[in-house]
Amino acid sequence: MPDSYAGAAEHFDLITKPYWSAIGPALHAVLRQAGDGPVVDIGTGTGLGLPTIGKALPAHEIIAIEPSPSLRIGLFSRLADHPELAKRVTVLPTGAQEAELPPRLGAVVGINMLGHLSPADRATLWNRIAASLAPGAPAVFTLQPPDRPASIPESPFGEAVVGRLRYSASGSAEPSGEHQVTWRVTYRVHDGATQLSEQTMEHCWWTVSEGQLDDELHRAGLAASSRDGLVVIHQQ
């Protein structure tokens, strides 16, 4: 399977860390409601969320699912720097659809990854969560725009400065199917006013609205509420 994040991996943490810093307190608070059983982090990326998960649940096993080989490089580097956390984290190099999960889950985390799943794959995921999630335990996801196929003009995603160089990312999207857009994300490196490099990645993204998500969850016996930008899912 092609690795759509290969061109983004070296910049990934620089661009996305501010987002994780922003949602960290809310994620920590929700995860304190976890039940018995391992915590599954779907689409863990480079593991930016793992320290928050680990602090919220210091005794839980964590299963980190990440299919991208290039992002797993950053993930294992992070775990190497957190040896105590690494003792509790098992990394599965698969997608959510293929991952073998334990029969009881204490919590599920899936930040900025739902767009990688088709409606059929989402339905399968919700059914698996409904069958495995401990009573009262949360599954925490996020919804990203657009919520339906639409053109999105290029806009900045973020930037960071390391030494003399400035790293930035911007993206645009175009409809590419009944429930899909294709994102085109460009990463640039500048030294002052001089652009040193530019790399663009494209990936398809399945759109889903809040209403669609509520319907899907209801059919699986689940329900959702919003909390500080997070979608918190529980058993009905």
What function would you assign to each model-found segment?
Residues 136-143:
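Conserved beta-strand signature within the Rossmann-like core of class I S-adenosyl-L-methionine
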Residues 143-208:
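SAM-dependent methyltransferase
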Residues 1-45:
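Conserved class I S-adenosyl-L-methionine
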Residues 206-236:
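C-terminal lobe and adjacent flexible extensions of AdoMet/dcAdoMet transferase-like proteins
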Residues 47-98:
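Class I SAM-dependent methyltransferase SAM/SAH-binding core
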Residues 100-108:
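A short acidic, Gly/Pro-enriched loop at the edge of an enzyme's catalytic core
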Residues 123-135:
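A short glycine-rich, Lys/Arg-flanked "PGG" loop and its adjoining helix->strand segment in the class I
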